[in-house]
């Protein structure tokens, strides 16, 4: 299988997000890379599902709480940016303070 660098990045994000979902389901608090992957994958899927940029940006602030992540992680993530594929093309989505 030949993948572009962008496709490899998406696959890596998805794999890390899957691991984060499983750990969260077991009641473990997510660390920094797990939280980033979890939120990023959810944003990419929401865009693919046809939500607007504004809806995806708002959705990104509802995915995790401080109780879902290790201490200090929310402060390490002031914003998340992801190039997501929407029905009308690829757009940059920025979510400020994704873990309120």
From Swiss-Prot:
Q: Which organism is it from?
A: Paraburkholderia phytofirmans (strain DSM 17436 / LMG 22146 / PsJN) (Burkholderia phytofirmans)
Cellular component (GO) terms are: cytoplasm
Name of this chain's protein: Urease subunit gamma
Subunit and interaction comment: Heterotrimer of UreA (gamma), UreB (beta) and UreC (alpha) subunits. Three heterotrimers associate to form the active enzyme.
Against InterPro entries, the record matches this protein to: Urease_gamma, Urease_gamma/gamma-beta_su, Urease_gamma_sf, Urease_subunit
Q: Which SUPFAM superfamilies match?
A: Urease, gamma-subunit
Where's it found, cell-wise? Cytoplasm
Q: Does the keyword Kinase apply?
A: no
Q: Which UniProt keywords apply?
A: Cytoplasm, Hydrolase
Taxonomy of origin reads:
Bacteria, Pseudomonadati, Pseudomonadota, Betaproteobacteria, Burkholderiales
Q: Which Pfam families match?
A: Urease_gamma
Q: Name one GO biological process term.
A: urea catabolic process
| Enzyme Commission numbers on file | 3.5.1.5
Which reaction is the catalytic activity of this chain? urea + 2 H2O + H(+) = hydrogencarbonate + 2 NH4(+)
Pathway given in the UniProt record = Nitrogen metabolism; urea degradation; CO(2) and NH(3) from urea (urease route): step 1/1
Q: What is a GO molecular function of this protein?
A: urease activity
Q: Which family does it belong to?
A: Belongs to the urease gamma subunit family.
